[in-house]
Amino acid sequence: MVYFRAHQPRHTPKTFPLEVHHSFSDKHPQIAKAMRITGIALAALSLLAVVACVIAVSAGGAAIPLAVISGIAVMSGLLSAATIICSAKKALAQRKQKQLEESLPLDNATEHVSYLTSDTSYFNQWESLGALNKQLSQIDLTIQAPEKKLLKEVLGSRYDSINHSIEEISDRFTKMLSLLRLREHFYRGEERYAPYLSPPLLNKNRLLTQITSNMIRMLPKSGGVFSLKANTLSHASRTLYTVLKVALSLGVLAGVAALIIFLPPSLPFIAVIGVSSLALGMASFLMIRGIKYLLEHSPLNRKQLAKDIQKTIGPDVLASMVHYQHQLLSHLHETLLDEAITARWSEPFFIEHANLKAKIEDLTKQYDILNAAFNKSLQQDEALRSQLEKRAYLFPIPNNDENAKTKESQLLDSENDSNSEFQEIINKGLEAANKRRADAKSKFYTEDETSDKIFSIWKPTKNLALEDLWRVHEACNEEQQALLLEDYMSYKTSECQAALQKVSQELKAAQKSFAVLEKHALDRSYESSVATMDLARANQETHRLLNILSELQQLAQYLLDNH
């Protein structure tokens, strides 16, 4: 997972500026360190000297030499304290910049790519990209009014064309961030078509992780014109500032010396000297800061700073960096835009494909359930039919034709039967049975061989003794009668059959539509794979252009340092 510390400073070109003029401590860090140690030692000695002066005056010792020593000690302490404060401030800024460099993603985004490769779940994948996009959005690729004025002085007649490219860079970067934020929304359809573990989508996210990580790691340190700070001192202004700072320091020393000479040597006046020295030191410090601020924001300093940049870096290096930055962001923006268009165009097909696939799965489950219920109901009908046949077959069979004829006449003359349809079926069955018996007796059997028992059962569907069914009529309901005599299905079986036919028709229609949609979805999947190859090319191009920009930034700083 990609985590960033809370309240982490922004990675932006302004954090890694082009230093137009390095100070003495930057050029000679070892000497500056020795001076800081000396200042700390002087501050400690000055405090000891002041304490010694107070004790000596209280004891009635030599006041004037001790007062002079105390004044010098106080002044040395003040200067040492000011030096320590400035050094600590600069050391803190350098430490902050080092922390920023350490917090940048590793080369080629190894940790993020490894994470995505080992854990490809949906939420973690998008959370990782979201964290990287949030960090990328902190890069500020805009130029404020003072820097624009400085660039206008540096570039001269080329300013208008280069400024147009700079504005396009800012606009492309903003649009690119917007597309990155909307990617998850664009890929809702493809995620449903090939959920989460799909190689094309995983590869695209992995490539985009590499691109964003490289941008976060290298773009802030390859800012070019975005790394320039207008409110810095030019060479001439820095010289003037140094002269004024030394003059004010000497003035404070002279003031403290005057106080020591003209004030009487007593304990209260030593306190006055100390307070006055402190006040003069604070006033000197504030005046120095005010002079520096005025010099940094003066038009004269801006013109001199522009001349210094023209002499050292020159407009060609800055223009080249603008060109490569424009090429980098234009290529990334166009690649992401093409990817978004492809994903948005394919989204309805993928969503419809996923919905239809889910519908087919649901209909298949319904079909299996209904088919099982239908077969079970058929088995129950067959068991009931066999049971009813056995019940009808158990009734006594008539011994002669006269009894049969009597029984037939009784059945034919029965007008009070509650089930006329059943009676009609019985009558038809009896007629068919008599006809069959007559034909069978005349062709195959003699009267002696005729057995009433053999020809007493009519078999329309099963072994039914229809001549005796009238006796069990009262024991069968309508559904059982139909089941027994007409090979009819029960009401439950009929319902299952109707539902099964309906689901079968819906399933066939869905499968037919799915076969057509599958081709379109495969075409869209191919286009998505093409977008993956485009992102791979964009990743290589991004790495190449960022390396070029980094080398140009180092060249610009080298030219500034060796001026």
UniProtKB/Swiss-Prot annotation:
Taxonomy, superkingdom: Bacteria
Chain ranges passing through the membrane: 37-57, 59-79, 253-273, 275-295
Main location: host cell
Subcellular location: Host vacuole, Host pathogen-containing vacuole, Host pathogen-containing vacuole membrane; Host vacuole, Host pathogen-containing vacuole, Host pathogen-containing vacuole lumen; Secreted
Cellular component annotations (GO), alphabetically ordered: extracellular region; host cell membrane; pathogen-containing vacuole lumen; pathogen-containing vacuole membrane
Entry keyword Phosphoprotein: no
Membrane topology: Multi-pass membrane protein
Keyword set, alphabetical order: Host membrane, Membrane, Secreted, Transmembrane, Transmembrane helix, Virulence
Described function: Interferes with host cell cytokinesis, centrosome positioning and Golgi distribution, and contributes to the morphology and stability of the pathogen-containing vacuole. May exert its effects by acting directly or indirectly on host microtubules.
Subunit structure comment from the entry: Interacts with host CCDC146. In host cells infected with C.trachomatis incM, CCDC146 is recruited to the periphery of the pathogen-containing vacuole but recruitment is not dependent on incM.
Record's protein name: Inclusion membrane protein M
Organism listed in the record: Chlamydia trachomatis serovar D (strain ATCC VR-885 / DSM 19411 / UW-3/Cx)
